[in-house]
Amino acid sequence: MKTYESNEYDVIVVGAGHAGVEAALASARMGEKTLLLTINLDMVAFMPCNPSVGGPAKGTVVREIDALGGEMGKNIDATYIQMRMLNTGKGPAVRALRAQADKWQYHERMKDTIENEPNLTLRQAVADELIVEDGVCKGLITNTGAKYYAKSVVLTTGTAARGKIIIGELAYSSGPNNSLPSIKLPENLEKLGFKLRRFKTGTPPRVDGNTIDYSKTQEEPGDKEPRHFSYTSKDSDYLEDQMSCYMTYTNTVTHDIIRANLDRAPMFSGVIKGVGPRYCPSIEDKVVRFADKDRHQIFLEPEGRHTKEIYVGDFSTSMPEEVQLKMLHSVAGLEKAELMRPGYAIEYDVIEPWQLKHTLETKNIKHLFTAGQMNGTSGYEEAAGQGLIAGINAALSAQNKPGFTLQRDEAYIGVLIDDLVTKGTNEPYRLLTSRAEYRLLLRHDNADLRLTEKGHELGLISEDRYKEFQDKKQAISQAMEAIKKVTIHPTDEVQEYLASVKQDRLNAGVSGADFLKRPRVTFDAVERLSGETLATDRYVKEQVEIALKYEGYIKKEKTLVDRLHRLESKKIPVDIDYNAIPSLATEARQKFEKIRPESIAQAERISGVNPADLAILTAYIQQGRIAKVKNK
């Protein structure tokens, strides 16, 4: 095709899903002239699978995005139809906020935000080829022949890269939700030397809410107490008129239908070659893997206020449509459910993420960044977190400034990216609280305290918001000092309260801080029993309560973090030749050469590397015996 010279930009972002919109907004807000390309303008920030945001670990990522100046938290706070805090009976490290989204409003508001952002141009086009000169990405060419030049390029192709939808015996080339696939770009990446692999994900059927018998299901309403993802949202704006979700179960009849049709299931017939997500298996996969289970939980989730489409959660399937109908009709409440959209599986290309730096810049092509599902992750939140980091670094690269990274002790986003670039992934990667060594430090409630300073330094947090943040920090400090000074005496009222929360009697007066450390004792109780007002903001009270109750555990984690920082400070020269290091185990040498860790701490996290290998590597570097990589 004949090409033509189009406009020039500082940063170009390819793909306007959850990664792409964060990347483009971050770049534009940092002052860079930014172009955002999407295959379809009607699918900006679209939710092709679950109409929700948040959940364990993921909810914390949304808070981190917000604390850094990203958009996802604000967008869901403006468009949710239900909000719930999960794991409220557990400790603060695993509490998680989850919102049910109006998926159409979510898309519309995000598109509106992008269209009204200075420095940002939104355009519909398919990126076919990168312009690369001397190992540096200079721009791209679209399917219409337009040549766009830029200082940095961010790729966020999602599941569109050579996407293939599969429903039973039917298979066809497609992106998510029957959008156009991206064919030429992944082919171009392979020609440029990138290693790609094939992953698979899936989505459940949607049914007509008018045809569900909700009397046979269990209602799951939202929370009455105000909850928010964005630190800028006000309690007074909390939605009272929320929509409920409903819970039901599969049964032995459902499982028998699935087992009788496994020969037609693409997952088991060999049609699907891509590796699927371990933590979001299809219903047919669950029935086979957990054959001893008589039933599996299903959530019926509304997709918005102005649609009757209901998402049948935890029922992902690629069975033939007729089998899907039989499966649905065997479930309590869905006996007469009308299918509106069948479930499907989608196969797509991903880049092997060990080919990336922690900035999400590719190692072999400068000024080229990748983010989101194309890096091997699953989930909107994981994508958005990566998109934000890639967008920040694309802007910094365009400004010739050093890159921005988050460490494992600073954010779940840091854990996610480090896992990807250090370990790679053999399946769609899902962020879990168990992946974070320092999860008591990386809580849902303190993302602003961890990251707002960084967002402000990057220019993504306004001066007004930064002042509010500083005021909150000061209020926490003042409340902490005040509660240490107040004394709780062993009065009858105090003893009665302690008995009500199943705590031992008080024998002598103690400080309010020591009193609060007792299990089930609350900050409000300290105020009531002391007769003192120590804080007025409930979020300030929450910070003081957590800091005191978990003081010992937090101190232990900070000791571990100090060790991490010492190892992170031991940098590995970029040009080291691992083949020149004597006594290094073959497996360690191969993995060091492939991943090329940036520090001893990162080298330690590579699977298959033992302490002896680390000791040899450390000694080699300290002795200054660095062998230069020979020019090939």
UniProtKB/Swiss-Prot annotation:
It comes from the Bacteria. InterPro entries: FAD/NAD-bd_sf, GIDA_C_N, MnmG, MnmG-rel, MnmG-rel_CS, MnmG_C, MnmG_C_subdom, MnmG_C_subdom_sf. GO terms for molecular function: flavin adenine dinucleotide binding. FAD binds at G15, A16, G17, H18, A19, G20. Residues 205-231 are annotated as: Disordered. Its main location: cytoplasm. It is found in: Cytoplasm. Its cofactor is FAD. Pfam families: GIDA, GIDA_C_1st, SAM_GIDA_C. The keyword Transport does not apply. One of its GO terms (cellular component) is cytosol. NAD(+) binds at residues 276-290. GO terms for biological process: tRNA methylation; tRNA wobble uridine modification. Residues 216-228 have a biased composition (Basic and acidic residues). The keyword Transcription does not apply. SMART domains: GIDA_assoc_3 (SM01228). Keywords: Cytoplasm, FAD, Flavoprotein, NAD, tRNA processing. Homodimer. Heterotetramer of two MnmE and two MnmG subunits. NCBIfam families: mnmG_gidA (TIGR00136). PANTHER family: GLUCOSE INHIBITED DIVISION PROTEIN A (PTHR11806), PROTEIN MTO1 HOMOLOG, MITOCHONDRIAL (PTHR11806:SF0). This is tRNA uridine 5-carboxymethylaminomethyl modification enzyme MnmG. It comes from Lactobacillus johnsonii (strain CNCM I-12250 / La1 / NCC 533). The lineage of its organism: Bacteria, Bacillati, Bacillota, Bacilli, Lactobacillales. The gene is mnmG.
